[in-house]
C-alpha cells in the first residue's frame, strides 16, 4: 500500500485529468451495476461532470513545469495540454449530443458512455505518449473504442458493414505502424524514448540506412489512415454513413486532434534530419486530400457521406500548418482545430435533430426546411458557411491564419491549392443552403411536408438543441476574438520546452 501511495504521489498529480476520467468510468460502471437495467438517463451527468472536472484541473496545471514522467514514457508540457484540452472539449460537447439519439434508438446507455470515456482517455494519453509502446497502447485504446462505437447499432446492416471495414483497415494500419516502430527500436540500438531513439539513430549512424526510410514511411501510413488522408481514406465515407451520427461527430474531431498531436511530435522528434523528405510526402497527401475530398463531396447525395469527404479536405488544410514546421504553423493548427470543433459538431447536431424527426439522411430531403423550422435551418446554414470559410464566421479567420502561416513558410503552391479548393467547398455548402430555403413545392419532399417542429426561437427543448446553439454561437463569436485565441495558443506553444528545444522554429 505504501508503494502504491508513493507511486501516486510521484506520478498521480501529473496525470490527474486522466485519473479523473478513469474515476468517472469506474463510478459509471458501479452505478449501472447497482441500478441494473432501470431507466437512468441521468447517467450522462457522470461522464459530463468528469470531463468538465478534467478540463478544470488541466487549466490549474497549465503553468506547471514541463516534465517527462513514468520512467520516460509520458511527456507533460503546454504543447500536449493544449491538444488534451481540445479533446476534452470535444467530448464534453459530444455527450449531450448523444442523449436524445440514444433514447430514441433505445441503445444501451452505460456501454456507450464507457466507450466515449475510454476513447477520450486513450486520446489524451496519446498526446503525451513518449515511447512507441505507450503510443501504440494509447492509439489502440482510442481505435478499439472507435470500432465498437461505429458498430453500436448492431441491428443496422450498414453499421455492421462500416465496423468491419473500419476494423480491418484500422488493424492493418496499426500493424504497419507497429512494424515501423520495431525498425526504430532496432536501428536506434534498443532505445525506447522518442528523444533517445533520435539520439540513437545519430550515434549508430543509421540515418542513411535503408531501414531509416522504412520507419518514417510506415509511420506516415499509420498516421495517414487515422487522419483519413488520401489515399488512406477509403474507410471514411462508409463509416460516416453507417455509424450512429453522435459517434461520427465524436470520431470526426477527437481522432484528428489526437493523431495530429502525435504526428507533430513523432515526426519532429524522431525524424528531424529527414524533414525535407517527410515534408514532401505530407505535401502530396495534403494536396490529394484537398482536391479529392472537395470534388467528390460535390457528387454526394447522403449528408453524412458529404461531410465525410468534407472532413478529408479539412484535414488537408490542417496539414498545411503541420508541414509549415514552425511554432506559427502549429499555432494555426491549434486555432483552426478549436474553430473546427464547434462548426463541425454544430453541423452534426443539426443533422441529429433533423434525422431524429424525419428518419432520412438524403440531402434532397432537406429542401424547404427553413419554412418548417427556421431556427434549425439557420443554425445549419451558419455552420456550413463556417466550414466553407465564409467571413465573418470563425472558419474564415481560422483558414486565413492557417493559409497565412503556410504562405510565410514558403508553401505557396500548397496554399494556392487550399484557396482554390476552399472555393469549391463553398459551392457545395451553398447548394445545400439553397435547398434549405427553397419555396418550390415540387422540390419539397414528404419528409418536410410532414415535419413536426418541436422547438421555438431561442428556446431549447432538449440538450441536443442546447449543444447545437452553443456550437453555432461559438463558431460565430470566436471569429471576432481570433487575436486573443492566437495569442494564447502562441504563448502555450512558446512556453513549451518541447517546441523550444526540439521543433524547427
Curated annotation (Swiss-Prot):
Please provide, in alphabetical order, the Gene Ontology terms of the cellular component aspect for this entry: chloroplast thylakoid membrane
Give the domain of life. Eukaryota
Q: Which organism is it from?
A: Huperzia lucidula
Membrane-crossing segments per the record = 15-35, 40-60, 82-102, 107-127, 132-152, 167-187, 212-232, 244-264, 278-298, 306-326, 334-354, 377-397, 400-420, 466-486
Q: What is the lineage of its organism?
A: Eukaryota, Viridiplantae, Streptophyta, Embryophyta, Tracheophyta
A biological process (GO) annotation for this entry?
ATP synthesis coupled electron transport
Gene name of this polypeptide: ndhB
Give the protein's biological function: NDH shuttles electrons from NAD(P)H:plastoquinone, via FMN and iron-sulfur (Fe-S) centers, to quinones in the photosynthetic chain and possibly in a chloroplast respiratory chain. The immediate electron acceptor for the enzyme in this species is believed to be plastoquinone. Couples the redox reaction to proton translocation, and thus conserves the redox energy in a proton gradient.
Where in the cell does this protein reside?
Plastid, Chloroplast thylakoid membrane
Q: What is this protein called?
A: NAD(P)H-quinone oxidoreductase subunit 2, chloroplastic
Amino acid at each position: 500500500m505504501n508503494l502504491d501511495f508513493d507511486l501516486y504521489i510521484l506520478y498521480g498529480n501529473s496525470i490527474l485529468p486522466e485519473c479523473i476520467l478513469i474515476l468517472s468510468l469506474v463510478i459509471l460502471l458501479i452505478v449501472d451495476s447497482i441500478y441494473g437495467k432501470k431507466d437512468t438517463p441521468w447517467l450522462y451527468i457522470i461522464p459530463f461532470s468528469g470531463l468538465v472536472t478534467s478540463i478544470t484541473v488541466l487549466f490549474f496545471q497549465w503553468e506547471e513545469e514541463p516534465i517527462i514522467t513514468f520512467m520516460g514514457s509520458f511527456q507533460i508540457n503546454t504543447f500536449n495540454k493544449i491538444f488534451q484540452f481540445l479533446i476534452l472539449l470535444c467530448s464534453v460537447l459530444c455527450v449531450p449530443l448523444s442523449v436524445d439519439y440514444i433514447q430514441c434508438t433505445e441503445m444501451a446507455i452505460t456501454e456507450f458512455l464507457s466507450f466515449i470515456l475510454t476513447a477520450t482517455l486513450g486520446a489524451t494519453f496519446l498526446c503525451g505518449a513518449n515511447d512507441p509502446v505507450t503510443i501504440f497502447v494509447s492509439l489502440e485504446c482510442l481505435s478499439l473504442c472507435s470500432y465498437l462505437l461505429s458498430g453500436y447499432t448492431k441491428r443496422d446492416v450498414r453499421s455492421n458493414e462500416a465496423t468491419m471495414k473500419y476494423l480491418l483497415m484500422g488493424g492493418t494500419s496499426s500493424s504497419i505502424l507497429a512494424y515501423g516502430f520495431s525498425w526504430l527500436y532496432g536501428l536506434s540500438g534498443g532505445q525506447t524514448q522518442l528523444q533517445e531513439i533520435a539520439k540513437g539513430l545519430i550515434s549508430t549512424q543509421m540515418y542513411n540506412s535503408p531501414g531509416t526510410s522504412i520507419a518514417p514511411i510506415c509511420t506516415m501510413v499509420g498516421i495517414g489512415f487515422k487522419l483519413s488522408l488520401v489515399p488512406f481514406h477509403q474507410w471514411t465515407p462508409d463509416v460516416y454513413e453507417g455509424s450512429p451520427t453522435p459517434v461520427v461527430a465524436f470520431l470526426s474531431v477527437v481522432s484528428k486532434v489526437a493523431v495530429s498531436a502525435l504526428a507533430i511530435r513523432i515526426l519532429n522528434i524522431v525524424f528531424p534530419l529527414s524533414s525535407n523528405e517527410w515534408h514532401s510526402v505530407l505535401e502530396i497527401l495534403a494536396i490529394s486530400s484537398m482536391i479529392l475530398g472537395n470534388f467528390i463531396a460535390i457528387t454526394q447525395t447522403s449528408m453524412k457521406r458529404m461531410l465525410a469527404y468534407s472532413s478529408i479536405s479539412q484535414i488537408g488544410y490542417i496539414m498545411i500548418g503541420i508541414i509549415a514546421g514552425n511554432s506559427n504553423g502549429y499555432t494555426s493548427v491549434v486555432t483552426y482545430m478549436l474553430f473546427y470543433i464547434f462548426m463541425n459538431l454544430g453541423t452534426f447536431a443539426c443533422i441529429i435533430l433533423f434525422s431524429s424527426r424525419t428518419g432520412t439522411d438524403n440531402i434532397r430531403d432537406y429542401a424547404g426546411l427553413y419554412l418548417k423550422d427556421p431556427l434549425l435551418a439557420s443554425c445549419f446554414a451558419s455552420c456550413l458557411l463556417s466550414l466553407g470559410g465564409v467571413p465573418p464566421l470563425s472558419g474564415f479567420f481560422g483558414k486565413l491564419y492557417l493559409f497565412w502561416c503556410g504562405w510565410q513558410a514558403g508553401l505557396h503552391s500548397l496554399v494556392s491549392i487550399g484557396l482554390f479548393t476552399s472555393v469549391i467547398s463553398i459551392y457545395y455548402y451553398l447548394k445545400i443552403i439553397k435547398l434549405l430555403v427553397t419555396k418550390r413545392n415540387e422540390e419539397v419532399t414528404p419528409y418536410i411536408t410532414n415535419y413536426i417542429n418541436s422547438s421555438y426561437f431561442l428556446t431549447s427543448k432538449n440538450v441536443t438543441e442546447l449543444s447545437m446553439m452553443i456550437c453555432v454561437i461559438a463558431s460565430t463569436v470566436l471569429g471576432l476574438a481570433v487575436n486573443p485565441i492566437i495569442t494564447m495558443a502562441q504563448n502555450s506553444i512558446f512556453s513549451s520546452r518541447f517546441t523550444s528545444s526540439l521543433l524547427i522554429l
